[in-house]
Amino acid sequence: GAGMATKLFLRCTTANGITDTGDGVVQDMITTAGSAATTGVVNTITGDNVQVQWTKTAGGLSMAWISGRVPAGGFTLTTCDLDAWCQENNMSANCSVRARVYRYQPGTPTITELGGPFDDDVEFGTSAASMTWIANVTDTAFAENDRILLRLFIEDAPAVNMATGFTCTLTFNAANATTGDSFFNIAETVSFKAEPIVGTP
């Protein structure tokens, strides 16, 4: 119903243990906010209608985020929205943010893109600012132990072409309601399963 939703913070932790998505690092996307801001930095390229997946460091590992496991009974994912703190190091970079949303099914993983891509279409400034936009995904049933996978990209901002030689920074993992509290909202109320504690007897 109205007002029911689940807010999933983009974290820099990797308690999920997932390594089979093809991404360089798969970070947690959970209901608990972080405590200290961290960043991902990505190099720009030249082009029109191009995208570059956000990286942990410039030229480094690509980043993705994944939810906990869906609880018994499952749910249907419908409308999502995002709030990501983004900036470019020079206004000549001509970048904005894009999200791609997927269903991750475990085993030999099946990763299904749920419509999109979903573009904010607002060029970044040169200081960290909250970019907010809607991801109206294809309504998709998630079964128990499925997960939501999120990838963020830079793309060329409207009416301009991305230019090479610059960087864009995503700030995330910060405390709630502070600069860098990047998050992904889903319309449904879902209590994702906690990750198993690794390394305890």
Segments from the language model and where they lie:
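Proprotein-processing/basic-patch segments
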Residues: G3-G68, A72-T79, D83-N89, R147-P201
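Aromatic- and Gly/Pro-enriched, solvent-exposed loop/edge beta-strand patches characteristic
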Residues: L10, N94-A163
